[in-house]
Amino acid sequence: KAQPIGDLFRGDVKRITILSLIVCACSLTAWWAFLFWNQQHFRNLAIDAGLDVKSRERLVSAAFFLVIGVSIPGNFFAGYLAKIFGYSRAIVIMFIGFFASMAFTFFIPRSYIELLYWAPAIGFFSGVFALFTMYLPPLFPTLLRTTGAGFCFNIGRISAAFGTVFFGLFSQVGDFRQALFYASFLFIPAIICAVLLPEPKDLKQ
C-alpha cells in the first residue's frame, strides 16, 4: 500500500525529500531546456548561415540524435563512476561536468558547426539520469521508497515543463543561446543539494 505524500515531509525524511526535490527539479529543468531550446538555436543558426529548409531540418535532426546517442556511453560512464566512488559522488561529478559543458558551450556565440562539436559533451553528462532510478528509492525508508522516488522525480518533470518555457522568455527574439547559458546555472543548486544527500546504505559497497 502506498504511503501518504505527507509522510515525506515529517521527521528526518523531510530533509531528504526537499533536497531530492531540488536535485530533480533543477537538473531536469536544465536538461529539458537544453533539449528543447538547443534545437531552436540550431535552426536559427542554420537560417543565418543561409541553409535551405531541407538542409537545416536535417541538421537539427542530426544534432538531436547525436546528443541522444552520446548519452548512451554517458550512462555507462555514470555507472562506472558510481561503482568506484558511490552513487552520491558520481552524481555530483556528472553534474559538475553537465554544468561546465553546458555553460562553456553557450557562453559565447558559436556557429552551428562549432556546436556540433560541443553539444555532444552535454549529452554525455546527461548519462547521470541513469543513476536516479537506483539512487533515489534507497534514500527513503522502506515503506516510502516508491512514493518518495516517484514524487520527487515527477515534481521534477513538472518543474522542467514550466522551467523550459520560463527560460525561453529570458532569450532575446531569435537568440536562444542566452536561455541555454542561464539554464546551465541550475546545476549549481543541484550540485549543492547532491553533496548534502547521503549515500544510501543499500548502495554502499
Question: Across the structure, where does each feature detected by a protein language model lie?
Answer:
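C-terminal ends and interior cores of transmembrane alpha-helices
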Residues: 96-110
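Cytoplasmic membrane-interface "Motif A"-like loop-to-helix N-cap segments
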Residues: 83-95
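A late C-terminal transmembrane helix in Major Facilitator Superfamily
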Residues: 142-171
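Interfacial helix-cap and linker-helix signal at transmembrane-aqueous boundaries
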Residues: 42-43, 81-82, 167-175
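Helix-to-loop junctions at the C-terminal end of transmembrane segments
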Residues: 74-86
